[in-house]
Amino acid sequence: KDKEILKVIACADLDSNKSELFSKNYKIDKFSVEEIFVNDDIDLIVNLTPPSSHFEISMKSLEHGKHVFSEKPISLSMEEGKKLYTAMKKNSVYLFAAPDTYLGPAFKKGTELLNSNQIGQIIGGSASFITHGVEGWHPNPEFYYKKGGGPLFDMGPYYLTALVKLLGPVIQVSSYSEKNFNKRLVDNPEVKYKEIEVEVDTHYVSLL
């Protein structure tokens, strides 16, 4: 809860029951979403909202002079990303986004090996993630199949970040995607609903 350079001040959620429970469990204050933005004791906001809300919450945070660490994706479009960048510069704050796995020891070692030419000339890299879906285990799988969800935004950032970190920026993209199923059947007994209307593509093949 409290570290030498970090103190958790409060939590907020549109669902007051969730924020109340979190507040009691971790013994921190519970604020409304709007209170989080204007509280002078808060320097950094961790944005863990659903993907479709990332841009709105991050933008309001930046406009109120707060640093932001956002869950992936940082936004749902390039235009939204540019607006966040502009707001960050204008308000002299920092904007970070998951995943931060590229800061780990494996990537540091990989970068070291590449830069020292110990493994020769690299001509490419590959990454894959294959699974049936999250509806069999996730406590709230519906968001995954709505706007801002799907494997591209949920798992893609891990692999894309790794490739860019090790091999450099992407210049050109060729990609194919499809939905596969229009509906997903939920077989997790803890989830109340049993069927999900799929709104996003769930299968991607890309060449970068």
Q: Where are the model-predicted features located?
A:
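N-terminal Rossmann-like dinucleotide-binding module
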Residues: 1-26
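Short active-site oxyanion
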Residues: 6-10, 43-45, 149-150
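Alpha-helical elements of Rossmann-like donor-binding domains used by nucleotide-donor carbohydrate transfer enzymes
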Residues: 21, 35, 44, 56, ...
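Short acidic-hydrophobic, aromatic-tinged amphipathic segments that line or gate anion-handling sites
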Residues: 29-33
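Beta-strand-loop-alpha-helix segment that lines the small-molecule cofactor/substrate pocket
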Residues: 44, 50-51, 55-102, 117
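Predominantly a Rossmann-like dinucleotide-binding segment in NAD(P)-dependent oxidoreductases
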Residues: 101-197
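Active-site beta-strand termini and strand-to-loop segments that position acidic
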Residues: 201, 206-208
